[in-house]
Amino acid sequence: QSEYYGSAPAAGLVDVRIGTDVGAGPFENYLLEQEFYESAMNGLQWIIDHKDDAWPGVDEEWFGIDIISLSWGITSHEDGGSDGSDMHSRILDEAMQAGVVVSNAAGNSGEDNDGLSGMSASSLSITVASTDDQNTVNRTDDTIAGYSSRGPRKDNGDGNPVNELIPEISAPGSNIVQAEGCVSSGGCNNFLGGDASQNSYTGRGSGTSYATPAVSGVVALVIEANSNLTPLQIKEVLKHTSELRGEPSAPDVDPYWNREFGYGMVDALKAVELAIFLRESGQTESIDHTLQSHGLNFSQSEIINITGHAWGQAGPVERVEFRIDGGEWKDATYSDTPSEIGALTPFLW
């Protein structure tokens, strides 16, 4: 116990080794090809294989593995970085499809990076950028951290530009108080034997590796609020409830994504509130990550006016419906006929 709490203090942890046989030493990433990291693949595959395990000695509510929090990157050794087809990206995609939410670090190569690594280029996982809170509690002055890797991801040529819009979410990752193991300092030495009784929270660190577990904790809260959400639906919940920052970097593809902040700064309260609403209203199954609809304006006098825009990421949208205070679902009116509008083309409703 300590005075410091993360975003999901009651979550359970399952430690899984993904380092190489000799650990993960300094500059190792720059010398070794991604294919060398078979142990990382083995660790991730182990999680997928054991995601439903009944762990001994714990209650049923603690069974299985729900989230992968991955604060590790590997130099891609490819011009322009990974396009998401490397082995690490593919296994993270596999984990998402298997029902395990993946939150992974975007990397710390800054604005002029040479692309994203295999641990940051997955098409399906939640890739996290890092913000700098300027040492204040006011979110209005938060900026993207200078070291945080920018997107987009290298084009994989599949004709769908949406999956290049990485990172997706940003979270605090600068000057973060961290757990620090007592190894050898002053009278404290537990390098060989001993226990963790003298470990502390005396260190501070910065990086997307710190932003990632913050988002992982928010994911845990969302799962607790609505356990019926799939990993891709959870990703949509985070995207739709995040606080937008920056101008759109690819407005022809998505008018909300920014190459620094993704779809915005994570908002735990709004994400949990939306998850609860979807559960209580019975609308969880209605969340489709290929369909986008966003409200633009709301006004109320004698008549309620709601406007927004919508689009499909993979094909046309058939219609947009709305209801007020749980009333009857009604069709919106449109600027154009939705079914005649192709993918990635927003229309007003």
Model features per residue range: what roles?
Residues 1-38, 59-66, 97, 121-125, ...:
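Subtilisin-like serine protease catalytic core
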Residues 3-5, 15, 58, 65-69, ...:
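C-terminal subdomain of the subtilisin-like protease fold in secreted/lumenal serine endopeptidases
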Residues 47-82, 105:
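Short acidic, glycine-rich surface-loop motifs adjacent to enzyme active sites
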Residues 73-75, 101, 107-111, 133, ...:
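Catalytic metal-binding/acid-base residues of hydrolase active sites
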Residues 84-102:
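Catalytic-core regions built around general acid/base machinery
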Residues 108-124:
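Glycine-rich, charge-decorated loop segments at or immediately adjacent to ligand/cofactor-binding or catalytic sites
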Residues 120-220, 224, 261, 270:
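Extracellular S/T/G-rich loop segment that most often corresponds to the catalytic His/Ser-adjacent loop
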Residues 283-349:
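Long, low-complexity serine/threonine/glycine- and acidic-rich segments characteristic of extracellular
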